[in-house]
Swiss-Prot record:
Cited SMART domains: AAA
SUPFAM superfamilies registered for this protein in UniProt: C-terminal domain of alpha and beta subunits of F1 ATP synthase, N-terminal domain of alpha and beta subunits of F1 ATP synthase, P-loop containing nucleoside triphosphate hydrolases
GO cellular component terms attached to this protein's record: plasma membrane; plasma membrane-derived chromatophore membrane; proton-transporting ATP synthase complex
The protein's name in its UniProt record: ATP synthase subunit beta
Family of this protein: Belongs to the ATPase alpha/beta chains family.
Source organism per UniProt: Rhodobacter capsulatus
Length: 472
């Protein structure tokens, strides 16, 4: 028999509920009705005198003292599995895309312990994305966590969509996208772009490759603080049921921290540095430790990270850095050159760019490419002031090769076909290593720079050079 209680106090997103008997456990979901709609409350504190303090997962306008509340007996539970593919859910697992109900045949609680040590897979393996600049210079590891840094309009969303597309094609895996405190318009745009690019199939939803979970900026802090966990729960189910590699996107992980800080203040906890919640590291750890590889499969997470006031020492981004295995930095300067994806080859890093994981050849080629690009960067001031003619012959050669490498790091994407007019390509890792090794060694010095722009492997470069020569 579910315990019954009544609302005794409403302060914004915080609701106090008093029970006659049978106090619900911390993190239990309570249900009440507000304006005829189901409202879920999550227990956060026990106050004594049979009263619990809860966080509301939706707006509390209209909720009154004395309203009846029932305990569900467990944490918030959401539908999971194939029924969620191609759908948009909210924090409590209700569909918000106006396409009917989602089957609750498979359901999971959003609060789960991290897999224990015995279940985790510890070997480092590269997750091949088919995107040259990432695979070569800042490779992603299976079950790793990747931070995606970039301002507005440099291509974060396009890169995220291409990764979803490639994981579906190359690894036939699923993706889960959690929109945490993002703009509703961006969420809507992403949904429609996914339909256009075929990642979501409206005719046959079960053939879609992605499930979406949204808690936008206008939602109360309770929803924004929990929506990342809802998305992660969906990803865990895909990993465990299919044993494949699952991609889990969070946009934006900073909003998760921000919502936690709002909730913390409402609960009356004393804030720590810069006004953040005292439990900042615990909250982040509880989310990040669940993102891991098990012997069944892996969850690889790509997290967009907003850096407040570009201050990397701010506690919110600084806490997330500790968990990251790789960083992909998108640069406005590179996007202005028309080079997409606009990944900065010198700023992006990866823990697994190590000869013992990726192999000696891959490591050496990556370091040679970065060395050449770094030399070009240091020569740019001289070129700007004195011109190319003042450089030594050796430096002229370095600059010529570096410019070819810079263009060769660009690549047409499937999801950006409408902008580029050319079909996207996924480049196998072996081809990427072989191609860049040859370019660094000077085997293609005779080919024009333009032949290296927006192509796949080196064979495409040669074919493009022949087309350019014929056209000339």
């Amino acid at each position: 028999m579910a315990s019954k209680g009544k609302v005794t106090q409403v302060i914004g997103a915080v609701v106090d509920v008093q029970f006659e008997d049978g106090l619900p456990a911390i993190l239990n979901a309570l249900e009440t009705t507000n304006n005829g709609k189901r409202l879920v409350l999550e227990v956060a504190q026990h106050l004594g005198e049979n009263t619990v303090r809860t966080i509301a997962m939706d707006a509390t306008e209209g909720l009154v003292r004395g309203a009846a509340v029932s305990d569900t007996g467990g944490p918030i539970t959401v539908p999971v599995g194939n029924a969620t593919l191609g759908r948009i859910l909210n924090v409590i697992g209700e569909p918000v895309d106006e396409r009917g109900d989602v089957s609750k045949a498979e359901a999971r609680a959003i609060h789960q312990p991290a897999p224990d040590f015995a279940a985790q897979s510890t070997e480092s393996q590269i997750l091949v994305t088919g995107i040259k600049v990432i695979d070569l210079l800042a490779p992603y590891s299976k079950g790793g966590k990747i931070g995606l840094f970039g301002g507005a309009g440099v291509g974060k969303t396009v890169l995220i969509m291409e990764l979803i597309n490639n994981i579906a094609k190359v690894h036939s895996g699923f993706s889960v996208f959690a929109g945490v405190g993002e703009r509703t318009r961006e969420g809507n745009d992403l949904y429609h772009e996914m339909i256009e690019s075929g990642v979501i199939n409206l005719e046959k939803l079960e053939e879609s490759k992605v499930a979406l979970v949204y808690g936008q900026m206008n939602e109360p802090p309770g929803a924004r603080a929990r929506v990342a966990l809802t998305g992660l729960t969906l990803a865990e189910q895909f990993r465990d049921q299919s044993g494949t590699d699952v991609l889990f996107f969070v946009d934006n992980i900073f909003r998760f921290t921000q919502a936690g800080s709002e909730v913390s203040a409402l609960l009356g906890r004393i804030p720590s540095a810069v006004g953040y919640q005292p439990t900042l590291a615990t909250d982040m750890g509880a989310l990040q430790e669940r993102i891991t590889s098990t012997k069944a499969g892996s969850i690889t997470s790509v997290q967009a990270i907003y850096v407040p006031a570009d201050d990397l020492t701010d506690p919110a981004p600084a806490t997330s850095f500790a968990h990251l295995d790789a960083t992909t930095v998108l640069s406005r300067a590179i996007s202005e050159l028309g080079i997409y994806p606009a990944v900065d080859p010198l700023d992006s890093t990866s823990r697994i760019l190590d000869p013992q994981v990726v192999g000696e050849e891959h490591y050496q080629v990556a370091r040679d490419v970065q060395g050449m690009l770094q030399r070009y960067k240091s020569l740019q001031d001289i070129i700007a002031i004195l011109g190319m003619d003042e450089l030594s012959e050796e430096d002229k050669l370095t600059v010529a090769r570096a410019r070819k490498i810079q263009r060769f790091l660009s690549q047409p994407f499937d999801v950006a076909k409408v902008f580029t007019g050319s079909d996207g390509v996924q480049v196998p890792l072996e081809d990427t290593i072989k191609s860049f090794k040859a370019v660094v060694a000077g085997e293609y010095d005779h080919l024009p720079e333009a032949a290296f722009y927006m192509v796949g492997g080196i064979d495409d470069v040669i074919a493009k050079a022949q087309r350019l020569a014929a056209a000339a």
